[in-house]
Amino acid sequence: MRPLSLKGHERALTRVRFNREGDLTFSCAKDKKPCVWYTENGERIGSYDGHNGAVWDIDVSWDTTKCVTASGDLTVKIWDAELGNCLYTINHQTPMKSCGFSYSGNLVCFTTQKMTKNLSTFQVRDLRDSSQMVEGGESFFYSQFDVNATTALFTQMDDLVTIGFESGLLQQYDLRNPDTPIHTNESVHRYSVQDLQLSPRGDFLISASRDKTAALLDVNDLKKLKQYKSERPVNSACISPNRDHICLGGGEDAMQVTQTSVSAGHFEAKIYHMVFEEEFARFKGHFGPINTMAWHPSGTIIATGGEDGYIRIQEFDEDYLGFTYDF
């Protein structure tokens, strides 16, 4: 592999994402400036200035015209992806933890943290309705939880959303009938769900958890299909767009890193066969746990973001591209 190492953040990465074509890489970290880069050469195009706290999540619309960020400064911001202008700001009483666009790019979802007397919430706003995009505006969909909702995403067009919780619970809601979840999975994870990502074709969902596992789920009913075990907590997992492979990233908890050798911390990204649940490759690079990862739409590149503040663009070599699994 021939990695590019990108240094544009002062603190630990929280999310990296590719746009639909894969020519741009979007990143955010525990500093206050989300960045956008050229994937091809690692050149930084610019940053989105306006947040005043750690930025926990970033997502980009299918046509790369808008991006959304969720921050610890109690705001979600929608940006003009090309010009970097802030289009809308949504305020809340507690920090925003995750965010995402729907398939059409017209709806934006986000989760908020549970804090003091405020419950954790999941909200959906419609960008086409300006009354929803102002402070105090009513949400298109609104739900409260006793347990922290840590991650959420749209899993089917603009209709279904899946939410992961600190307790390991997974729930799926239909926005057309929002009263109760249509599917629930309480058994797949024992600890916090750190990340949820959809397969490129939209038929599978992969969840990463602090219980040292990642799970492949049927997007229609959240039924567990496969489970991948690691030696350390899994912070992020992604699915290859053109092969039956998945990749896990994580490592020893960031609080323990100063007491951990690089080899014992399991800071490598690990590639598993999707069907056989067996690890067959891993790649190193980060000095500290991997917090986030994304598979490029071409299937030949993985981007990882670590606690060390670096983004690594890992391009696969011929050994991987020509690899066939013996079974």
Swiss-Prot record:
Repeat positions for WD: 8-49, 51-89, 188-227, 229-268, 285-324
Lineage top rank: taxon: Eukaryota
GO biological process: cytoplasmic translational initiation; formation of cytoplasmic translation initiation complex
InterPro entries named among the record's database cross-references: eIF3i, WD40/YVTN_repeat-like_dom_sf, WD40_repeat_dom_sf, WD40_rpt
Principal place of residence: cytoplasm
PROSITE patterns from the UniProt entry: WD_REPEATS_1 (PS00678), WD_REPEATS_2 (PS50082), WD_REPEATS_REGION (PS50294)
Subcellular location: Cytoplasm
Stretches assigned to coiled coil: none
Keyword entries, A-Z: Cytoplasm, Initiation factor, Protein biosynthesis, Repeat, WD repeat
An example Gene Ontology CC term for this record: eukaryotic 48S preinitiation complex
Subunit description: Component of the eukaryotic translation initiation factor 3 (eIF-3) complex.
Primary role: Component of the eukaryotic translation initiation factor 3 (eIF-3) complex, which is involved in protein synthesis of a specialized repertoire of mRNAs and, together with other initiation factors, stimulates binding of mRNA and methionyl-tRNAi to the 40S ribosome. The eIF-3 complex specifically targets and initiates translation of a subset of mRNAs involved in cell proliferation.
Family: Belongs to the eIF-3 subunit I family.
HAMAP family cross-referenced by the UniProt entry: eIF3i
Protein name: Eukaryotic translation initiation factor 3 subunit I
Organism from which the protein derives: Caenorhabditis elegans
